[in-house]
Swiss-Prot record:
Native organism: Xenopus tropicalis (Western clawed frog)
Compositionally biased intervals (Basic residues): 71-84
BP GO terms, sorted: methylation
Sequence ranges assigned to domain SAM-dependent MTase TRM10-type in this UniProt record: 98-289
Lineage of producing organism: Eukaryota, Metazoa, Chordata, Craniata, Vertebrata
Entry annotated with the keyword Transferase: yes
Compositionally skewed regions (Basic and acidic residues) per UniProt: 85-98
Name of this protein: tRNA methyltransferase 10 homolog A
Length: 334
């Protein structure tokens, strides 16, 4: 017998939400459930009390049903999360294996590369901070290199050391680097030293891995032009410049930052070719363009190019890279 809501006075009414539940609970019972029976009020109260318990159970069941889609969505999100975690773990394992393989392919070079930090008193603090960043870049590049060099920091102290301590004391845990307070002449034989300076008349053609090449750790914006060359002469050590002018035409005469010189040497050790090494490192803002095999600049037309920053170091760029306007080369029809 179907149940219908009754609102007549003196008769018990059952909440519509409870109908189905009450009906199902009385299924199979020989005594039919009648909502609109004329029961006394005391009997109605007892039935109302029963209804509350049943209502609580019903609401709980209803809440469960209402949240079915939410639970389904949560299970889906959980599965997706586990899937992403498995993918991330797999990628991590691949990267780890790749790094292991890469480290197995690394062949350290015997070449020693020294950053001379003895110019501390010639730099303002802002330039010392720049040098600190360049040194950190050198260290990071050397750690990733196929042929890492034997990296030295010499005459380490003063403002530079204080700034490195302030910036991040983690440098004391750096690996595969020799950080020394001593001058390089007290650490390495004089005949093995070669100062890389843009003012040297000597031009490197190859790198001798039995030598120790020195990069001047100086950020001076050309305020102390030629100081590294003079220092090499005073100490009576060999000097040379990178063969940049044989392969590259620059839009201005600018010396390279410490990290650029360092990266060019790392690139040459890997590629064994100066031109490729230069163009894999030189920033575009320096307006570098290749020379032809005859050593002449191809026919080009002037174009606008954003001016770069001042040079950061007095190290090793070939001075024959003379001032030229920024250019864009056109392909010539034969």
């Amino acid at each position: 017998m179907s149940l219908e809501a009754v609102t007549e006075p003196g008769k018990c009414s059952i909440d519509p939400n409870t109908k189905d539940l009450l009906a199902s609970q009385h299924a199979g019972n020989n005594t039919p459930l009648q909502e609109n029976s004329s029961a006394p009020r005391s009997e109605c109260k007892a039935q109302d009390a029963m209804s509350k318990r049943q209502m609580k159970k019903f609401l709980k069941q209803k809440q469960w049903e209402d949240q079915r889609e939410l639970r389904k969505q949560k299970r889906k999100e959980k599965r997706q999360k586990r899937k992403l975690e498995r993918q991330a773990q797999a990628e991590h394992n691949i990267d780890a294996n790749s790094r292991k393989r890469f480290r197995h392919e690394v062949q350290p070079s015997a070449l020693r590369l020294i950053i001379d930090c003895s110019f501390d008193d010639l730099m303002a603090l802002r330039d010392v901070k720049k040098l600190n960043k360049q040194i950190r870049r050198c260290y990071a590049e050397n750690r990733r290199a196929v042929h890492p060099v034997q990296l030295y920091l010499t005459s380490h102290g003063g403002q530079l050391k204080s700034n490195m301590d302030e910036y991040d004391k983690g440098w004391i845990n750096w690996k595969d680097i020799h950080i020394k307070p001593e001058h390089y002449k007290d650490l390495i034989k004089k005949e093995d030293l070669v100062y890389l300076t843009s003012d040297s008349p000597e031009v490197l053609s190859e790198l001798d891995e039995t030598k120790a090449y020195i990069i001047g750790g100086l950020v001076d914006h050309n305020h102390h032009k030629g100081i590294t060359y003079k220092k090499a002469l005073e100490l009576g050590i060999s000097h040379a410049q990178l063969p940049l002018g044989n392969f590259v035409k620059m839009n201005t005469r600018k010396v390279l930052a410490v990290n650029h010189v360092f990266e060019i040497i790392l690139a040459f050790l890997e590629k064994k070719e100066w031109k490729e090494a230069f163009f894999s490192v030189l920033p575009q803002r320096k307006g570098a363009i290749p020379l032809t095999e005859t050593g002449e600049q191809p026919e080009c037309r002037a174009s606008e190019q954003e001016d770069g920053e001042d040079s950061d170091s007095d190290s090793s760029i070939d001075e024959s890279a003379t001032i030229q306007p920024s250019v864009r080369c056109e392909e010539q029809n034969s």
